[in-house]
């Protein structure tokens, strides 16, 4: 049903553009999204060489996971992984399609296979009447999705970052989720959209899933999504997890890995939290002051 909706949104966009003239096609944000995806696919088909920095352990983990998946092993059940299995399966499929692809770029861009269709739904929901708004959402999405670099610099060597891939992909999915909650009308379509977005977050990184849950709670309290749609999204989400569990107890193994990692890093959680808080103080402090000011004015 979601795939039909996505295809329908894209076709409706092009049909409407065709009626207005071929020049209108270039004004469609969905057209530019599809065009850039084609360009990225072309780049993956080429044997490119890019600097990935001295800290490239995440890129190596992708290669190890891909080799294990090709041997028939299941992430979580047969080998431990630091995050969810979605990124590894997308990378494995991408490597089969583009065997000459630059590995970091493939790892970074493979998540677009899940995020781009969801973003197309958001752009279709905005409609041609508000194209400026649609492009304002599309440009950051493409920047976050395409450029494999972290916000903070950990080394002085110029180049890209071969680590932190999961965090970048999680941020991209959260961006898509927030966009959908803001611009898709309340109803079944929004419920299915949220279920798929939350499923992608859960299967990518559990911390992103928790953040997405808080965002969903805020949307529920703000009236952007109804209780009925929330329940429908939760049912769809759990149904897919139940199906995935049949694949060698993948989900219970994934949750066991999460519990094991939390236990191993329990003593380091508070220092890491304080490190993140101090690193993002320029955002957290002004935001907190704005919340206090708004609360005081009301």
Sequence positions of predicted segments:
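Transmembrane catalytic cores of multi-pass membrane glycosyltransferases
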Residues: 42-62, 68-70, 79-86, 102-106, ...
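Membrane-interface alpha helices of multi-pass inner-membrane proteins
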Residues: 178, 190-206, 211-219, 237-241
